[in-house]
Amino acid sequence: MKLRKLLKIFSSIIHSRELFPYARIIPSSFTREDGKMPLRYLLNYLIFRQGMSLSEDICRFYPDLNNINPPSKQAVLKRMSILNYDVWHKIQQMFLERIYLPMKKKTMKGYLLIAVDGTFATLPNHPVLGSIFGRKTHSNDPEKNGHSPPQAKVSIAYDVLNKVILDFQVVHQDISEIPLLFKHLEVLENVLKDYKVIILADRYYGSAELFKYCEMKGYKYIVRAKSNFFKKERAAVIPKCVDTVLHILIHKMWQKRIIRDHIRRYISIYPIMHVRLIKGHYEYDEEHITTSGNRKTIHHQLDAEYFSNLSSDEFDTEDIIHIYHTERWDIETNYGTMKTLLDIEQLNTANPISITNEIMAKIIFANIENLVRNTAEDKNCRPGEHLVNNKHVIELCRSSWFVRSFFSRRLSVEKLKELVVECARVRVMIREGRHYKRWDKFRNTVHQPHHRIDGRKNPPLKIIKTGFATSNH
């Protein structure tokens, strides 16, 4: 579908009357369509907000949409607090049905690559948020417990080839990765049923229950292996063997530990599990800054292992490693975009309902922006050498004319062509082996960065001869 049609469908979803039952906590809410902030205004406001304060967001958003006086800050906060965040899941469901399923999709050897991962979003330091979402605990220093800021766990399922967020959850920080993964897969079951799928996940998602579930549904998977998985079978593998198949019997006692009934019943009928084990070896040099300010190169060796059920005839050892380390990394990049460019941790209240709405709305915006970026990437004349500058695309999608056109559903063909050309014009060079440096970044002063670095806000600093450098310990 053309970009204009995709955006018009997306806008019609935001304005759909089907959303009203899902948006109401109080039955009498959002009944007036002639007020300053009916439901469609509130949803668009939350999706496109970008300021550093509530006042800035209101002043940016309302003059572009109507000639009436903007609502007060108290009115906006009140509307946010009575908006049921289930409405964002309904919007996502309609997006999948009306946009994702009909769209032409990129695949790898006929497979969709669906990555699942989670991150933490730092919340305002308020006792209610600490109770609702939890706080980080310090096992090494119990005296710090209760003093860390609250944080919510954000989990998404992401189509890495098509750059589409398929499902999202915002939950308590202590919720484990595996239950969230199953929740994603259950939500997407009808969406993925007609496709060949490869599930990509890191080491915290692996389980016999997941592997047998994928076997039931016909899904393929690539999961980073933990060292304590299938010890007996792995010990029998010849040390120099880098690609083999493990045959694992799930015995009766093991079956009793399976949580989901339908998977347990399936395992009781088919107790043998065939898991492909792939081994990879990496060597690289890393440069560190010593306390004297000198640079020291340290040579690292790393052995990594992966579980999969893909056939070796279809995907060889190098293919598996490439998919995991290259393609799966897009979900990490997506989280970086949400935290640094979309500013998902910029929150205007300590109300847990409002905070959940603010976070989920920016995830919806990410899908709108990805539609524009994908169209611009198709116009990229040198795709192997350059990428469209995502920051520039986000700025254009937040511009006044785009917000006004999206809200009114009057999307000019000429203006959209200009938008795509401008997005494709500003590009960044692809430099192999280059990555964002997290540790040993030099600083001449101590400052408090707003965003996290590798999951840490305000990472530890070590004192060096000429200033400071970030540290991972």
Where are each of the predicted segments found?
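Generic structural motif
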Residues: 66, 114-116, 277
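Helix-turn-helix DNA-binding helix
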Residues: 73-76
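Active-site-proximal, Lys/Arg-enriched surface segment
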Residues: 79-158
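Single, function-defining residue in the core of a domain
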Residues: 1-54, 69-70, 80, 91, ...
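Short, charged amphipathic recognition helices of the HTH superfamily
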Residues: 51-65
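"Short basic amphipathic alpha-helical interaction patches in structured regions
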Residues: 60-62, 127-134, 170-171
